[in-house]
């Protein structure tokens, strides 16, 4: 994000006055710097009285209700404060759009790195460290699934009833909505679409134990400690809900690179040597989880199905000239790879 674009969305004078009213330091907001990330949300780091902050607010034209999404994120971060889930610490939040034009919150900066962007020397130079990084990712999903969401104040945060039954029709409806985009070739360009959907419906687990789930859990949405292979924080909480936490492991199954480092969804790390296979991670998850993991493959197939249909949306928009053609074709290719992976897990 350019300096000009973030300045249009974050009025530092109004933010400073708001912080004054909250007792969050005094004086100027120094060193305001936009941070890159995996979303279109505004992330702005600044310092006041020697304390660093990161502000997060929705973009100018968010998909859906950006204010409600931001409020939900802040609620989750607040609820996680007393848990062992690694997360950015919430400092304060504003639910009204009156201050900056959108709801926003302030959190502590994370001392860590995104492995999909690059590895520091400690991690790049030691295959054993990289191996542990993978299990740390799974540990994060396990910790999140163990949270007592009622005790944490998140009762009613998601629609538990019929959660699994809604998945296939919900994401198929999203795919069908892409017909509104001119020149999109339609569902027929996705291999085995109906076959995967039918398999998911036939093999759907009989029940689930509801829990807190991230909703987009993969290597690019965590940050690692600079001094160890452990997680520093899980980030990008905008899809978090109460549902079936096994789907977070299913998301790992869908996005985990193959042994040669090739990926279904452009989420990878270099060097890839040292990282365990997805089968090893599934076995580890099953050994550490108190949930019924006998149908973990089903969640992996669902992860492929869901992510593939979400990515196809960018391709559909690109066909109508509403997104980059290059990006659209790249993500359509990822969709195809995800459905090919789903077919392999179905056998």
What is each stretch, according to the model?
Residues 247-289, 303-320:
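Active-site activation/catalytic loop segments of kinase-like enzymes and analogous catalytic loops
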Residues 1-25:
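Juxta-kinase regulatory segment immediately upstream of eukaryotic protein kinase catalytic domains
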Residues 158-159, 292-303:
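All-alpha amphipathic helical-bundle segments outside canonical DNA-binding/catalytic cores
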Residues 235-240:
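Activation of the activation-loop gatekeeper triad in protein kinase-fold domains
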Residues 32-196, 203-212, 226:
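ATP-binding pocket architecture of kinase catalytic cores
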Residues 212-214, 219:
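Catalytic-loop of the protein kinase fold
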Residues 291, 295, 309-347:
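Helical subdomain adjoining the active site within ATP-dependent kinase catalytic cores
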């Amino acid at each position: 994000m350019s300096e000009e674009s973030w300045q249009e969305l974050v009025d530092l004078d109004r933010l400073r006055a708001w912080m004054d009213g909250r007792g969050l330091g005094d004086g100027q907001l120094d060193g305001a710097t936009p941070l890159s990330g995996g979303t279109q949300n505004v992330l702005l780091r600044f310092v006041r009285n020697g304390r660093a902050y990161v502000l997060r607010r929705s973009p100018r034209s968010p998909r859906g209700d950006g204010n409600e999404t931001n409020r939900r994120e802040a609620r989750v971060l607040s609820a996680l404060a007393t848990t062992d889930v690694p997360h950015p610490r919430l400092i304060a939040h504003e639910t009204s759009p009156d201050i900056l034009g959108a709801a926003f919150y302030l959190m502590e900066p994370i001392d860590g790195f995104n492995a999909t962007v690059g590895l520091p020397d400690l991690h790049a130079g030691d295959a054993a460290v990289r191996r542990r990084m993978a299990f740390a990712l799974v540990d994060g999903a396990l910790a999140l699934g163990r949270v007592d969401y009622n005790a944490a104040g998140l009762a009613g945060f998601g629609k538990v009833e019929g959660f699994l039954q809604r998945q296939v029709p919900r994401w198929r409806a999203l795919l069908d909505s892409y017909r509104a985009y001119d020149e999109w070739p339609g569902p027929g360009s996705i291999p085995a679409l109906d076959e995967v959907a039918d398999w998911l419906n036939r093999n759907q687990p009989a029940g689930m134990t509801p829990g807190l789930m991230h909703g987009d859990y993969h290597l690019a949405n965590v940050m690692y400690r600079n001094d160890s292979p452990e997680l520093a924080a899980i980030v990008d909480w905008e899809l978090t809900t109460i549902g079936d936490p096994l789907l977070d492991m299913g998301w790992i199954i869908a996005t985990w690179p193959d042994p040669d480092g090739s990926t279904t969804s452009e989420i990878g790390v270099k060097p890839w040597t040292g990282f365990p296979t997805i089968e090893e991670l599934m076995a580890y998850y099953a050994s550490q989880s108190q949930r019924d993991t006998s149908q973990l493959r089903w969640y992996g197939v669902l992860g492929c199905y869901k992510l593939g249909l979400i990515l196809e949306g960018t391709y559909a928009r690109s066909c109508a000239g509403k997104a980059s053609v290059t990006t659209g074709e790249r993500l359509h290719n990822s969709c195809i790879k995800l459905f090919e992976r789903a077919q392999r897990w179905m056998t």
